[in-house]
Amino acid sequence: MILNELDSFSAKLKAFAAIGICWVLLGLYLSGYWFLIKIDIPPLQTTLMTIIDYWRYYGDNPAVQKWLIICTAGGFGVPGVAAFLLIAPVKKKLHGDARFATTRELKENNLLGEKGFILGKWGRKFIMLAGQLGALVSAPPRSGKGVGVVQPNMLSWPDSVVLLDIRQESWRLTSGFRKTFSDVHLFNPVDRKRRTMQWNALDYVSDDPMLRVNDIQKIGNMLSPDPPDGDPFWPASCRTLFLGLALYVFETPGMPRTFGEIVRQIMFGEGETIGEHWKNIIEERDASPNPLSSACKAALYDFIFTSGNTQSSIRKTFTAKLELWLNPLIDAATSKSTVDLRKLRSEKISIYIGIKPADLDYLQLIINLLAQQILELNMQEMPEDNPELKYQLGWIMDEFTAPGRMPIVAKTIGYLGGYNIRPLIIVQSLSQLIATYGEQVAQTIIECCAAELLYAPKSRRQAKDVSDQLGNTTVKNTSKSRPQFGMKSGTNSTSDTPRPLMLPQEVRMLGKKRQLIFVENMNTILCEKVFYYKERVFKKRLLPPAIQAIGDYTPPPAKVSKPKPKPDVKPEAQVLNEAGQLVTIVTRPIGVEDIESIDKRSLTDYNIDFENITTPSGDPVTDEEMQAVFGSFLNSIAD
C-alpha cells in the first residue's frame, strides 16, 4: 500500500512528461533566440516556431545549416543537462561525505546576524544563535569559556538576563555596562557588608487561600524533590511538614512570612515535645476566633501523629535542609524581595547570582531554589497572550551543575523557548552533566539545545565521541606495487577509504583559539573563539562595576520561651541533720541541671530502694551473678 502519492508510478510518469514538455518548449525557444542573435535580428521576436521555420526554409543551405545545428544543439542541450541534474539521484560517496560548514551555510541558517547568543567568530563577524533557541557549552576549566562565551554575551545581550556568576567576575566586568540600560542586582546572601539583592521565595505565595497551598507545594517540591533513586518517604514527609509550617506562618497575623521564621517555629518547643507543642497550638487556635485551616492542621497532624523515632527523623531531615536560615545573614537576605522576578520579561533586569567558590557547597540549596523559581514564575504566561512580555530572558548558567540537580530544568528544557526563556548552559564536560542528571536526562538536555559548543576536550573518551559525531569522509588512497619477475614497472591502484573528519587526537589539538559548534540541521562549524578583550566593541563597554545597595533588614523579635513545668515534689520525712536541726527530706526527679554535679553527690543523696537488689552468694562470684546484681541495681534506680 502506497501512503505517499508521489511514489506511485502514475505520479512519476506525469512528472517525467511535464519535464519533457518543458524541455522541448524551452529548447525550441532558446534555439530560435540564439539563432536570431547570430543573424543580427532582434531576439525578442523569437517564438516557439522560429527555429522550425528556419529549418524548413533554409535547412538545405550549407552556410545556414551549420548555425542551425549549433543553435539547436545548444538550445536543447543546456536545458537537457539541467533537467538531468535535477532528476538524477545524488551520488553518495561510499564511506561518507562529512565536511565543515561554509559561509553560505551559516548565512542560510541565520547564524551571522546581529541578535542572539554569541557562540564564536567567523572572519570579522560573530556567530550568533538567534530566535528562541538555547545552547550548551562544554569547556574544561581554564579553557576560556568566560572570555569567549560568558563576558561577550553579558556585554551584548540586550534584554533581561540571569547569570550564575561564580567568583563575581562578570559582575566586576559587565555590571557597569548593563546598568546603562537595565536594573542590575547582585545576589550574594552571605556578603559580610550585606550588599545583596534581597529575595524571599514566599513573597510569591498567593494571599488567596484557594491558591496558597498550590504555591507552597511548588516551593516544597523545589526544596525537597523526590530522589531519582531511593525511598521518597523522607522528602515527601519534609514537604508535608513544610506545608503545615508555612500555612501556619501565613495564617498567623503579624508573623514574618519568611523561611527563617519557619525554621524558628520547628525548632521551638522548649519544655514539651515538638509534637505536644504543635498539638497545643492547634487546640489553642481552634478555641480562638482565628482557627487554622483544615489543610494546615492536616499537614501538621500528619507530622504529630507519627511515631517518636519517625517524627524525630523527619524533623532532623527538615532542619538539616533549612538550617541555612539560622544564619542571620541569610535570614536577612531572604526576609523580603527587592526585585519582582515575575517582571523579567516585561522589564530589562539583570540578576547576577554571585556566590563565591568557598560558599558554593554551603549555599547550594538557595541557588537551586532561586534558579528554579525564576523559571517557574516566568512560565505562567506565553508572550502571545500578554503583549507586555516583550523581552527575552537569557538564563545563563555558568557551572550549571554547581547548584545540584534542578528537576524543573529536566522537565521543562524543551518548552523554555516558547516562553522566551533562552538557556545558555555551561559545563566543564558532558560527563559532569551526566553525573548530576543521569544519562537519559542529560541526553534530553543536550538534544533540546539547538547548538552545542565544544572546546578542545581533555578527556580521550570525549575526544573519541566528538570524532564519531563529526563523521567520516571518503579519501582516495593510491597504492603502488613493486615490479616482480623481471617486469619493468609496477602498477598503481586507487581505492576509496574512510577517514574521520577529525581524528580524536586532532580534536584534542584544537588549541586555544579554535572550537567546534554543532548546530541542528547543518554541518559542523569549525571556527575561532571570541576574546572579548580583543574586540573593540566590547572594550568600549568595560565600565566600572555597579555598586549593590545594602539590604534592609529588621531582626525578628526574640521569642519568649514557655517556662518549664516545675517538677512535682513532696515531703517524705523530717529528720535531724548533723547540726541537730530538723530538716524535711523531699523527693524530686533528676533533672538536666543535676548532670554537672552528679559525680559529687553521695549515694545518700538519692532516694533508692536497695531491698530488691539480690546479693550474690557464690564464692567466687560468677559473671552471671554480677550481671544479675548490676541489673537489679539499675532497676532500683529506674524505680
Residue ranges with predicted function:
Residues 413-415, 419-516:
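Conserved ATP-driven motor cores of ASCE-family P-loop NTPases powering translocation/secretion/packaging/pilus
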Residues 117-122, 335, 435-436:
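Short gly/ser/thr-rich secondary-structure transition/capping motifs
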Residues 22, 71, 238, 296, ...:
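Generic recognition of cysteine residues
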Residues 1-143, 147-150, 201, 472, ...:
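Basic- and hydrophobic-enriched, low-structure N-terminal and domain-boundary segments
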Residues 3, 26-36, 89-93, 126, ...:
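P-loop NTPase motor domains
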Residues 11, 98-99, 117, 121-124, ...:
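General secondary-structure edge motif
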